[in-house]
Design a protein with these regions (language model features):
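Short amphipathic alpha-helical interaction patches enriched in hydrophobic/aromatic residues
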Residues: 15-19, 34, 38, 125, ...
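A short acidic/small-residue loop/turn micro-motif
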Residues: 115-116, 126-131
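C-terminal domain-tail junction helix/linker
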Residues: 174-178, 200-261
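Short small-residue beta-strand/loop micro-motif enriched in glycine and branched aliphatics
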Residues: 120-124, 181-183, 207-209
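Mobile-element integrase/transposase regions
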Residues: 47-112, 136-141, 145-146, 151-153, ...
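Basic, flexible linker segments flanking DNA-binding modules
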Residues: 1-90, 242-251
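RNase H-like two-metal-ion nuclease catalytic core shared by retroviral integrases
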Residues: 9, 69-73, 158-160, 166-170, ...
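Mobile genetic element proteins and their domesticated derivatives, centered on retroelements
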Residues: 10, 15, 30, 49, ...
């Protein structure tokens, strides 16, 4: 039989290990992970677990987010097909966005495509420029993940940036029978899934780490982050299930995410 001191020591060691993989993994998600590994009797309820983190100075400070886009171009801007729409199955709606990543002496651009049903990252590309060919690489990865071919049931939603509206990108969507949807104003909530994905990667990982030294290090670390996010980190919007499990067929749970958490 273990003592309370031993129980707390084990819990803190597990928290430290998970925080090494995801430096800003929050208390609620840690509770889900540790309960799955150690059992509810050992870990205790969520509130007592959060209090344990607080006592041992393991709670995380809140971070502020940032964002960018350029829609001053001559290409056709498609209407928003996602207003009021909830994704009903994997590959129903894909949300695309580009965010910047600082490295020593430079900036890189992370192109992402997230599945709206499972919240899994299906495609990504880290590049040294905002050229559309880099954005298209993330799309190619997502199409491969979805099995390729005819994706006529899929809606691709993005902001109105030139990378998403240009002929190179639009033709790739049309070749795979993917419907095109774009935001109609500059409200971040019009592409909330993508904005939330950016925030998770930055707030839970990137902002907490030392600045990446170069492109190669950034690619390696971000690849590891996305793998952890997809396959290990519980996601509150799908009932604390793992995004890739839900993408591959597991039924999502109730949305547990609230802004005040």
């Amino acid at each position: 039989m273990y003592t309370e001191v031993q129980r707390v020591k084990v819990i803190i060691e597990y928290v430290d290990w998970y925080r090494m993989q995801a430096p800003r993994l929050g208390g609620v998600k840690l509770h889900v992970l540790l309960t799955g590994e150690l059992g509810h009797e050992f870990v205790g309820g969520r509130d007592s677990f959060i209090e344990l983190l607080r006592r041992h100075h393991l709670m995380l400070p809140k971070k502020k987010a940032r964002h960018t886009t350029d829609s001053n171009h001559v290409y056709f801007k498609y209407p928003n097909l996602t207003a009021g729409l909830m994704a009903q199955y994997p590959n129903h709606v894909w949300y695309a966005d580009i965010t910047y990543i600082w490295i020593e002496g430079d900036v890189l651009y992370l192109h992402l495509i997230t599945d709206g049903y499972s919240h899994a990252v299906l495609g990504w590309c880290l590049s040294e420029s905002l050229e559309a060919e880099n954005t298209a690489k993330a799309l190619e990865m997502a199409i491969r993940m979805a099995g390729g071919g005819n994706l006529c049931g899929t809606i691709h939603h993005s902001d109105r940036g030139v990378q998403y509206a240009c002929q190179l990108y639009v033709s790739q969507l049309r070749e795979n029978h993917i419907r095109i949807s774009m935001t109609e104003c500059y409200n971040p909530t019009d592409n909330a899934v993508a904005e939330r994905m950016n925030g998770i990667l930055k707030d839970e990982w990137i902002y907490h780490q030392a600045m990446f030294r170069n492109y190669e290090e950034a690619v390696f670390e971000i690849g590891a982050m996305i793998d952890f996010y997809n396959n290990v980190r519980p996601h509150m919007s799908i009932g604390n299930k793992k995004p890739m499990d839900v993408y591959q067929g597991e039924r999502p749970g109730k949305n547990l995410w609230k802004k005040d958490r």
